[in-house]
From Swiss-Prot:
Source species of the chain: Salmonella typhimurium (strain LT2 / SGSC1412 / ATCC 700720)
Name of the protein described by the UniProt record: Surface presentation of antigens protein SpaN
Disulfide pairings: none
Function: Involved in a secretory pathway responsible for the surface presentation of determinants needed for the entry of Salmonella species into mammalian cells.
Gene responsible for this protein: spaN
Principal place of residence: cytoplasm
């Protein structure tokens, strides 16, 4: 195999082809000789019985190749008989077993003892820490490949769908649904959060606010002059109402309505059939809707004769022929 650190640009480990298996022993020896001097200062390097010193970045592709292909099948790449080939294959497998053990030990040993986190957190944290005595971009790529494989294996066996585990290495949370940043909501939590935010401005709250504003208006009784002084007397009005010199308008018990924010004033001395419905339009403006034409005539004559600057009467024959507007220009309310 030509390059012992065969790692593609995407991080996938490239295993040797079948025709390259025969040169595995030579490649292993060359790799050991090449990296022996580079990692001579690393006290954690191991000896492998055959005076081979192997670092874990170099061990990864050779380990995978040895376990996949086993002993060499072509004799022209080696010197010796069949028994020598068999012995050579066993030696490589024995080295591969030691490489596997040392790779696991060294991955854990790179994490400081005072961190004391689980294995998956340690492997993830070691990816973000600078490694001492490691040179070359290919070696770093091999290290990341080792940690990625270990991380996927640990997460698949140690984390269930109902358990979310925080990894302090780079502030990630791993769940059965995938990996997300700490503090970010899961996909199943996004829909309820948006629905709760959308319900904050319900129209019921606005209607309640309008009713509250109308209920704070002063409910003072309004007096109307003697009915005999209004329009010369209407024959259709009740006699009991015409005989009274003075009357007072009081709000009834059904004063404020929650739906349309209106007040209903009933003329108690006239009877329950005579009333005025007052609806709030905007600041200082109200709409008065008489119950019948008799009440409309009385109010119209009173406003024209009493205080035309204070009262303003309008009619809309298309929408509501009995609709009237009341414009309030001063803060105090005088008797009509």
């Amino acid at each position: 195999m030509g390059d012992v650190s065969a790692v593609s640009s995407s991080g996938n480990i490239l295993l040797p082809q079948q025709d390259e298996v025969g040169g595995l022993s030579e490649a292993l020896k060359k790799a050991v000789e090449k990296h022996k001097t580079e990692y001579s200062g690393d006290k954690k390097d191991r000896d492998y019985g055959d005076a081979f010193v192997m670092h874990k970045e170099t061990a990864l592709p050779l380990l995978l190749a040895a376990w996949r292909h086993g002993a060499p099948a072509k004799s022209e790449h080696h010197n010796g008989n069949v028994s020598g080939l068999h012995h050579n294959g066993k030696s490589e497998l024995r080295i591969a077993e030691k490489l596997l053990k040392v790779t696991a030990e060294k991955s854990v040993g790179l994490i400081s003892a005072e961190a004391k986190v689980d294995k998956s957190a340690a492997l993830l944290s070691s990816k973000n820490r600078p490694l001492e005595s490691v040179s070359g971009k290919k070696l770093s790529a091999d290290l990341k490949a080792v940690e990625s494989v270990s991380e996927v294996t640990d997460n698949a066996t140690g984390i269930s769908d109902d358990n979310i585990k925080a990894l302090p290495g780079d502030n990630k949370a791993i769940a059965g649904e995938g990996v997300r940043k700490e503090g970010a909501p899961l996909a199943r939590d996004v829909a309820p959060a948006r629905m709760a935010a959308a319900n904050t401005g319900k129209p019921e709250d606005k209607d309640h606010k309008k009713v509250k504003d109308v209920s704070q208006l002063p409910l003072q009784p309004t007096t109307i002059a003697d009915l005999s002084q209004l329009t010369g007397g209407d024959e259709k009005m009740p006699l009991a109402a015409q005989s009274k010199p003075m009357m007072t308008i009081f709000p009834t018990a059904d004063g404020v309505k929650g739906e349309d924010s209106s007040l209903t004033y009933r003329f108690q001395r006239w009877g329950n059939d005579y009333s005025v419905n007052i609806q709030a339009r905007q600041a200082g403006e109200f709409s008065l809707i008489p119950s019948n034409t008799q009440v409309e005539h009385r109010l119209h004559d009173q406003w024209q004769n009493g205080n035309p600057q204070r009262w303003h009467l309008t009619r809309d024959d298309q929408q509501n022929p009995q609709q009237q507007q009341h414009r309030q220009q001063s803060g105090e309310e005088d008797d009509a």
